[in-house]
């Protein structure tokens, strides 16, 4: 089960929260994971996941991550998903144990051997209460039982030394078929049939008041049905964090003006990115709903990741940021844009409408929603269906990119 817990922590947890939330989690886990306080930025999601497996072998730190998500208002849905995934893993293990107990066949695989040890726990406990002689005759099985009991005790979440979580009793396990790719039954009923909604997206029906920081001009993209549609990107912030937003209803463009306060509901969240479509609600915030966004949140929202950190990322991770174009090489099917900063350089592959855009060396490229990919071990950023590029010419303001 250790691998399953690690999978949940990494793929359904750390990879699904935004950069600010991940930095907050690392800050709270400094003591538990012995992180360098002055150099927390260097730790990537998979490094943190590996460290959590070593520190919390019983559940790979899943309980700590769930408690963290429960304490962040915008991550409560993520906490529910992780709980259901954990229940599903436990339920599948229990069903497998029951099947093994009902079957006369002798387990031969490693998994079956582990399940047999679980059965030994029950049978040995019963025999220990009957006679001492049977206990002596089952010394080998008792050894397995002790190991299982030790593991069972470790499954209970310990008291946190820091503010990451609080002591809590184990959550009752219930049967659930939910996964990160299937929203909860409650959300499924209200989820519209919209192809823009990614698999595993979480519906947030409760209202959230945010301040608009930036918004791009609308641009065309090709939908999964091969239809040409329009959308735009935006960045919004609350009092505690910022979000990148994909807006698939361009009629809302006027509401997404800088420093405007809006209240959104019935929106989706996927991997820390908010998605607003035709069924979402976006209203002007009432005066009493106005919020004050700290300057540090605004700075973090406008900051670009270091290229060395991008290179350490997990394949599929989405990146946003402004980078200097170092080299441009036009090919038949795509264009290679080499971007560079003080920490290194990386190739950006543009195809479709991002093939041979109007830019030259020294220009600034503002990348929106580019995905990290590895080919032959080399990391590169590639465009996707919702990618967008803005070009800043030397001494000029940002402008939407155009094909030469």
Swiss-Prot record:
Q: Where is it localised?
A: Nucleus
Q: Which Gene3D superfamilies does the record match to this protein?
A: Death Domain, Fas, Nucleic acid-binding proteins
* Main location class: nucleus
Q: Where is the composition biased (Low complexity)?
A: 102-112, 122-132, 168-185
Give a yes or no for keyword Nucleus in this entry. yes
What is one process in the GO biological process aspect for this record? Answer: response to bacterium
MF (Gene Ontology): double-stranded DNA binding
- InterPro entries linked to this entry: DAPIN, DEATH-like_dom_sf, HIN-200, HIN200/IF120x, NA-bd_OB-fold
Q: Where is the HIN-200 domain?
A: 192-392
The family line of this record is: Belongs to the HIN-200 family.
- Its biological purpose: May act as a transcriptional regulator in the myeloid lineage. Inhibits cell growth via p53/TP53 and RB1-dependent and independent pathways.
Write the protein's name.
Interferon-activable protein 205-A
Task: State the encoding gene.
Answer: Ifi205a
């Amino acid at each position: 089960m250790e691998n399953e817990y690690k999978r949940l922590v990494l793929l359904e947890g750390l990879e699904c929260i935004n950069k600010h939330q991940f930095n907050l989690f690392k800050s709270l886990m400094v003591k538990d994971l012995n992180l360098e306080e002055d150099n927390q930025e260097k730790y990537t999601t998979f490094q943190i996941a590996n460290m959590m497996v070593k520190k919390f072998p019983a559940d790979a730190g899943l309980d700590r991550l769930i408690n963290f998500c429960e304490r962040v208002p915008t991550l409560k849905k993520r906490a529910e998903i992780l709980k259901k995934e954990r229940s599903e893993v436990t339920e599948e293990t229990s069903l497998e144990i029951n099947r093994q107990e009902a079957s006369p066949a002798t387990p031969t695989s490693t998994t079956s051997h582990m399940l047999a040890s679980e059965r030994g726990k029950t049978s040995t406990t019963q025999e220990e209460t009957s006679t001492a002689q049977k206990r002596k005759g089952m010394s080998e099985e008792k050894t397995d039982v002790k190991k299982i009991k030790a593991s069972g005790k470790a499954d209970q979440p310990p008291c946190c030394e820091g503010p990451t979580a609080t002591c809590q009793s184990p959550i009752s396990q219930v049967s659930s078929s939910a996964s990160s790719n299937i929203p909860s039954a409650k959300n499924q009923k209200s989820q519209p049939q919209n192809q823009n909604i990614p698999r595993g997206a979480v519906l947030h029906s409760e209202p959230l008041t945010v301040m608009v920081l930036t918004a791009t001009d609308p641009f065309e993209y090709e939908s999964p049905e091969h239809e040409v549609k329009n959308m735009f990107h935006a960045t919004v912030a609350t009092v505690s964090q910022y979000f990148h937003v994909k807006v698939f209803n361009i009629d809302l463009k006027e509401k997404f003006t800088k420093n405007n306060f809006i209240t959104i509901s019935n929106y989706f969240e996927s991997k820390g990115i908010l998605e607003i479509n035709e069924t979402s609600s976006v209203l002007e915030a009432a005066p009493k709903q106005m919020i004050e966004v700290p300057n540090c949140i605004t700075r973090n929202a406008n900051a670009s990741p270091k290229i060395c950190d991008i290179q350490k990322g997990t394949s599929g991770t989405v990146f946003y940021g402004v980078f200097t174009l170092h080299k441009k090489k036009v090919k038949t099917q795509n264009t290679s844009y080499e971007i560079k900063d003080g920490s290194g350089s990386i190739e950006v592959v543009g195809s479709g409408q991002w093939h041979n855009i109007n830019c030259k060396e020294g220009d600034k490229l503002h990348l929106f929603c580019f995905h990290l990919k590895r080919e032959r071990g080399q990391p590169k950023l590639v465009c996707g269906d919702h990618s967008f590029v803005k070009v800043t010419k030397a001494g000029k303001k940002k402008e939407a990119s155009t094909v030469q």
